[in-house]
Curated annotation (Swiss-Prot):
Signal peptide as annotated in the record: none
Additional information: Toxic segment of the protein is located in the N-terminus.
SUPFAM superfamilies assigned: delta-Endotoxin (insectocide), middle domain (SSF51096), delta-Endotoxin (insectocide), N-terminal domain (SSF56849), Galactose-binding domain-like (SSF49785)
Protein's GO biological process: sporulation resulting in formation of a cellular spore; symbiont-mediated killing of host cell
Its job: Promotes colloidosmotic lysis by binding to the midgut epithelial cells of many lepidopteran larvae.
Family indicated by similarity: Belongs to the delta endotoxin family.
Alphabetical list of InterPro entries matching this protein: Cry_V, Galactose-bd-like_sf, Pest_crys, Pest_crys_Cry1Aa_dom-IV, Pest_crys_dom-III, Pest_crys_dom_I, Pest_crys_N_sf, Pest_cryst_cen_dom_sf
Gene behind the chain: cry1Aa
Name assigned to this protein: Pesticidal crystal protein Cry1Aa
GO molecular function: signaling receptor binding; toxin activity
Superkingdom of the source species: Bacteria
One protein family per Pfam: Cry1Ac_D5
Amino acid sequence: MDNNPNINECIPYNCLSNPEVEVLGGERIETGYTPIDISLSLTQFLLSEFVPGAGFVLGLVDIIWGIFGPSQWDAFLVQIEQLINQRIEEFARNQAISRLEGLSNLYQIYAESFREWEADPTNPALREEMRIQFNDMNSALTTAIPLFAVQNYQVPLLSVYVQAANLHLSVLRDVSVFGQRWGFDAATINSRYNDLTRLIGNYTDYAVRWYNTGLERVWGPDSRDWVRYNQFRRELTLTVLDIVALFSNYDSRRYPIRTVSQLTREIYTNPVLENFDGSFRGMAQRIEQNIRQPHLMDILNRITIYTDVHRGFNYWSGHQITASPVGFSGPEFAFPLFGNAGNAAPPVLVSLTGLGIFRTLSSPLYRRIILGSGPNNQELFVLDGTEFSFASLTTNLPSTIYRQRGTVDSLDVIPPQDNSVPPRAGFSHRLSHVTMLSQAAGAVYTLRAPTFSWQHRSAEFNNIIPSSQITQIPLTKSTNLGSGTSVVKGPGFTGGDILRRTSPGQISTLRVNITAPLSQRYRVRIRYASTTNLQFHTSIDGRPINQGNFSATMSSGSNLQSGSFRTVGFTTPFNFSNGSSVFTLSAHVFNSGNEVYIDRIEFVPAEVTFEAEYDLERAQKAVNELFTSSNQIGLKTDVTDYHIDQVSNLVECLSDEFCLDEKQELSEKVKHAKRLSDERNLLQDPNFRGINRQLDRGWRGSTDITIQGGDDVFKENYVTLLGTFDECYPTYLYQKIDESKLKAYTRYQLRGYIEDSQDLEIYLIRYNAKHETVNVPGTGSLWPLSAQSPIGKCGEPNRCAPHLEWNPDLDCSCRDGEKCAHHSHHFSLDIDVGCTDLNEDLGVWVIFKIKTQDGHARLGNLEFLEEKPLVGEALARVKRAEKKWRDKREKLEWETNIVYKEAKESVDALFVNSQYDRLQADTNIAMIHAADKR
């Protein structure tokens, strides 16, 4: 910027940034976890993982209920206290935090019980435990939530009220979905479902009511008041209204499968000005008028920024927005010019790239300019420059800079929803619009301040309709409004604005894009409120689809509340004819002057059942639990090779039509798990490609051992060992683990899966033999004994047919001195290794043996792997065993040497020389027999 001699004062901008956030080299570095961060993560979770099951339960634990302590809950209270300038009394504060702590502790117990039950859902004790835990959790929440609505503190307690309400609805949904499997009777389940639907409305209306009360409370006439008003609106949209907008999805009978919602509401960062929070009297209303009125959602394509100059200072003087409707890229339309089209520099074009603009770094400029002697001072409040950063899930995209990059970071007030990835991928909002606060007061001051509007990233651009989920599309994503239809402010719980009609006619047209096969059939549902009975008509590309009569939901003049809206549908399914289609909704057969409000439409796959969704969720959970972390770096130690094969079966049995992409992704993860399992397995040829193939490596065994391909029990090869008629010649299978593969002072584990066995002896030998005899009845098949193993169309085992539940957490290890339980198909045997010596190459011998006529065994998925380093008594014990073995070996060597020496002397005495080619003259047959006995 050019220097100007008329400058008298230059005040650096105080960005009022969050002290827990710094901007370093363009990257946002988090040093704290605020209520807004938590709420954004929760909203992301609810938008992406809204499926009942242990995954959802444990997700709530991970995000909030398992990590929060008193200080984190207090931060939620402090956030609103500061906004409304009201302190919660110490008693009410302590009571609220204590209740939240109690709920957190109780829910962690509930979540663990849920996890255990889901792993073994037919276990009577676990079913009873779930009934107990649900009743305790439901009772605690029913008692606690009214305490978060304490008189005079409803607003400052609002965000924790919503967190508790969300938890309560999730628990009630659990019993609605799983209650029968837990053992509750139908009457109890229906009663709890009725509680769920009633409380969805109650909790929603309460939250919206007190949000509006708080918002009205912080309104005032000056810019300082507007800043607080806008902050309250923005932050409680994130911590309260966004979560409440998803409450209706907890209705498990209306949304039995994965449901995708979208938040189309906008939030606003403050006009980027120096001294904005306190320098402008009576301007709050003027600033609020700068906020965009309710409108259809559009896609921001370009911002053309103009530059003006005032006494040597260049600044953002105006801009023009070019956008397009949702659903397709054209035709574009331009908004009227905001501000004025200055020509002090060429216009700067900011074009949409990647997933949109997720961040702005702005540089406000304030100058007090002395025009001469006397009081003729003029103040300049403008924007000197902005950097626009573009979102991308994969790569860093170059930003666009208007003049210069600043320090006022939009991420400080609208942070990412996922801090585990770069902000460009974890962003929560994208820039949706820019208006201009413009004011001039003659020779007193000049003000030009762009105001940025932001939309949640869940509001996608294309109105995509897949086959595998219920798709909710807000009607504000329509392409065109019918004549007489208007966009009005939403009631607060719809996640955005809504449409309104007061006379019969077309409501809107919506362009949708179908990613499913065109043969996929759907049913349409409409969420509406109306003061009159009416008839809805739907059509696709001008082709009539559905027509139905529906009733009034509210009285004329009533406020819109949760109960005012009803979700209704048509029974006749249909399919789309084109991948890109226009859906039209109309309302007819009612008198003008009535009010009809439309929130959203829903496309429900006609054939999708909850079972398919449950299978996917179960498979995802099973795959994720194979690994030690979410990045799949390592396998959990207790995950067996057999377990991985069973998880692979779960994935292979998923529906291609319902979740092909997810199935392919899970399949790759299972293959990775299998590779990790092979890498840690010290056995050679664990999948039995052959026996006696090589003399010095791999498996050696009896000639009557057979290798068989996978069946309904084993996914891969397994071996069958038969009995023997001669105990001196047992059936055997063995392999030696080379010394070079072993670590000193480490415990190793042999484990595998036995389909059935009788008199199977298992040995691990190093310093001595570890030995177990295992008898497993022939019920190892996943199939009921009364049924024949299912066969696929090509003769292969059908692993996707209904089968008995398999419990991956069954503990059936054989420890020192123990016998395996007779019904444990999983076995494991430990052995401790002391000092290693490559010269001795002692190794570990793995041996399976049957020495009875009735003996037999079928086994596979064998593993020999490192378990843990030896410490303490185990270390001392192996050292004693090693010393005892060495002492015994040395004694045997000493005794052997003596015997050898005596024998050699006896033999030497028989011959005349060391070549042993001629006997002594006196050597006789008795002397030879005596030497032979040596």
